[in-house]
Regions:
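Membrane-interfacial segments
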Residues: 82, 125, 150-154, 158
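C-terminal, active-site-flanking charged/polar segments
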Residues: 135-146, 152, 214-218, 223
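Short low-complexity stretches enriched in small and charged residues
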Residues: 20, 101-104, 155-156
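Alpha-helical bilayer-embedded segments of polytopic membrane proteins, i.e.
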Residues: 54-71, 95-146
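Membrane-embedded catalytic scaffold of the fatty acid hydroxylase/desaturase
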Residues: 1-97, 158-247
């Protein structure tokens, strides 16, 4: 993330993820993750229902393909220079430690490394074209799987609690926590509840505290939601999309 040109620039990521999403998960008008591509995908009731939303249970995969290159990288930089806030909900800061000084260079580096370098290495060939396109879009789908299914389900949206830690739990969703492949695929984000409660803890340690968190939630009557398989979580996400595709 200190280089930050292949995933998201640190400036945009801090506003979108750290300041916005982690502080206000699934809170309408506060969490920027509810407002990615709102013309095509509807995640909250304050987004006016439009015709493209009727088909979002089928078209969401298209937004997953471009989620990283178009939204996190390019649109994040564009908003930083041209908009007062990220996704209209997180006001951009500008100070000695948090500014846009290096954004243009990072965007150029992204274009060179991801899209131009393959042609330099392989020439104007089909191999060059495939290496220029497939890796970033494949990664984008993997990242969107890791980030969407663990918050955007019927059980976790439109939830709120004044207690900060309880709110983190009821708006997050654990996925296949006993599956090591899913852990590797998501980088540990499948233990999303634990990640939101302890965001600075390395994900390799989250499985050690998972049972303690689950038992504490049960003891105090806090809704701890989880899917036993990745497929179950994906189905839950599609159910969420279906719910918000209707008036």
């Amino acid at each position: 993330m200190d280089i930050g040109f292949m995933f998201s620039t640190p400036y945009a990521w801090l506003h979108q993820h750290v300041i916005g999403h982690h502080s206000f998960p699934n809170i309408v008008g506060k969490d920027p993750d509810l407002y990615h591509a709102p013309k095509y995908i509807r995640h909250s009731s304050d987004i006016r229902l439009k015709k493209p939303h009727f088909y979002q249970t089928m078209t969401f995969i298209l937004t997953w393909l471009v989620g990283v290159p178009a939204s996190l990288v390019c649109l994040g930089v564009f908003q930083a220079f041209n908009k007062p806030s990220y996704n209209k909900v997180v006001t951009f800061a500008s100070n000695k430690h948090l500014n846009t000084d290096s954004l243009k260079l990072r965007l150029v580096l992204y274009g060179l490394v991801i899209h131009i370098l393959p042609f330099i290495l392989h020439g104007l060939t089909l191999r060059g074209l495939l290496f220029s396109i497939l890796p970033i879009y494949f990664f984008s789908v993997c990242f969107m799987i890791s980030s969407q299914i663990n918050h955007l389900t019927p059980h976790n949206t439109e939830q709120f609690d004044k207690n900060f830690f309880k709110h983190q739990v009821i708006t997050s969703h654990d996925v296949a926590t006993d599956n090591y492949f899913v852990f590797l695929l998501t980088g540990g984000l499948n233990m999303q509840i634990e990640h939101h409660l302890f965001p600075s803890v390395n994900h390799c340690h989250l499985h050690k505290i998972r049972d303690h968190v689950r038992n504490t939630c049960r003891k105090h009557g806090v809704n701890y939601t989880e899917s036993l398989t990745l497929w179950e979580a994906l189905c839950q996400h599609v159910n969420h999309l279906r719910n918000f595709s209707k008036p």
